């Protein structure tokens, strides 16, 4: 029997075919840490080169700036299903077995003690035990070993390490990503997934783990090739879950995972899009398309600049004033097609399609001005959640998706350091930093959200570099005065596998935000900067509305992959789902 071995680190999404005598490659993942220097404040004047209207300038820019258009990409759908069969009976391209370190235990005769591995190894004539020993495969997270088995029902059998225990959503999502990587490497069209320790799982745990694996598989297959001249289409068509149960409950869990995953992909595509393609108008168009797609439950209201002026959104419009691309205020409303509405929620996202910093321009490589398309990340998460919710259609809950979309640019019409602006709730703000613009747009967005009569608001934004200093790149900061709302959102984040850490709302820090000429300044300095930013936002939320702020600046981008993460969608959708009846 000819057998070829493949080894990899799951997080790298790369598989290497090797002979038995080779050693597995050691590929480790790393996090990129942003080092934030003190802000350089540079102010200068720019003489306008033309006197035409912003609308005309927008048309010219959109027609000539790079002549770039995204390639049309259809995301292939994967068929997910469950079966209760013997693992040795399945026929297809890859049988992927998730194993913990405990599952890899062997007896005195070097045979597996785990029942599933023992049966599978006997079916393969002892090859599984031999290969795992030779390759020092122990079930550690990131380890993967794949055997080619021509002539048998499964063309390949893979062992994928889950670590000491498999109990977290992120562990099962990583398993799904490893399945996707193996499928891409071998051009497999059919995969079956089994957990070696599934017999110890409760029925609910089996359903949840299947959902997480499905999510990881969909996202692991995704590659954003819209701006590349060549791309490859994934070959994977079907994934069968063996030993996870069958019937409507499993089907519903798998469908939920699919809907959320495609919402995450939509978010990734928005954040990945360059600013010369994704303008505020295009972002608004994408939102309107969602309303059209889910017209039985969703409507769109896009406010233009004049309408925002009528609503006295001076804070938001001050940020937008310098750009040739006019602002577009996005408001999507989800209402169930039937039944009473018991709860009204709002999801508010920061929507800067590009942030130059304004007159306090971003200078130096540490401030990554070339990457400032990522400032659309909060709004992208909100719209990704809208897409998923349009598919899932949770009952009994009304959801408002709100984005104040604009660019923060530099021109003779732009806001200047020292300007005093007035938000739509009448609060005045001294602009002591034009690069602290996100909170200015969110201020009017939060006032608008409260005016919709909602019970709870969650806003999400790439708001401060200081949160990266505080928490690093693996989690987002969360701020709220409501313990109950904090519990709700933390529970949603834990179920989704997205890490949040509750930060203090230290009111004494408000002293840093006081102005001599206005009600407040918009930047209180770097010390406690993420906290003071949250305290600023709090001033624009009605006292009768529960509110929570997520600062996701460190989680929006994966520098190693040079791509957006899609962070926030899963947590927001889970939170909405938990508030439905």
UniProtKB/Swiss-Prot annotation:
Residue numbers binding Mn(2+) 1: 350, 355, 375, 437
Active site, renumbered: 362, 439
Catalysed reaction, written as an equation: Release of an N-terminal amino acid, Xaa-|-Yaa-, in which Xaa is preferably Leu, but may be other amino acids including Pro although not Arg or Lys, and Yaa may be Pro. Amino acid amides and methyl esters are also readily hydrolyzed, but rates on arylamides are exceedingly low; Release of N-terminal proline from a peptide
UniProt remark on cofactor binding: Binds 2 Mn(2+) ions per subunit.
GO biological process: proteolysis
UniProt-annotated binding residues for Mn(2+) 2: 355, 435, 437
Family in the record: Belongs to the peptidase M17 family.
Role according to the record: Presumably involved in the processing and regular turnover of intracellular proteins. Catalyzes the removal of unsubstituted N-terminal amino acids from various peptides. Possesses Cys-Gly dipeptidase activity.
Enzyme class (EC, first level): hydrolase
Protein name, entry field: Leucine aminopeptidase 3, chloroplastic
GO cellular component: chloroplast; chloroplast stroma; plasma membrane
GO molecular function per UniProt: dipeptidase activity; magnesium ion binding; manganese ion binding; metalloaminopeptidase activity
Subunit structure: Homohexamer (dimer of homotrimers).
NCBIfam families given in the database record: PRK00913.2-3
Needed co-factor(s): Mn(2+)
Keyword Cytoplasm: no
PANTHER family listed in its UniProt record: CYTOSOL AMINOPEPTIDASE (PTHR11963:SF23), LEUCINE AMINOPEPTIDASE-RELATED (PTHR11963)
EC number from the UniProt entry: 3.4.11.1, 3.4.11.5
Keyword Repressor: no
Keywords assigned by UniProt, alphabetized: Aminopeptidase, Chloroplast, Hydrolase, Manganese, Metal-binding, Plastid, Protease, Transit peptide
Predominant location category: plastid
Presequence boundaries: 1-50
Subcellular location, record wording: Plastid, Chloroplast
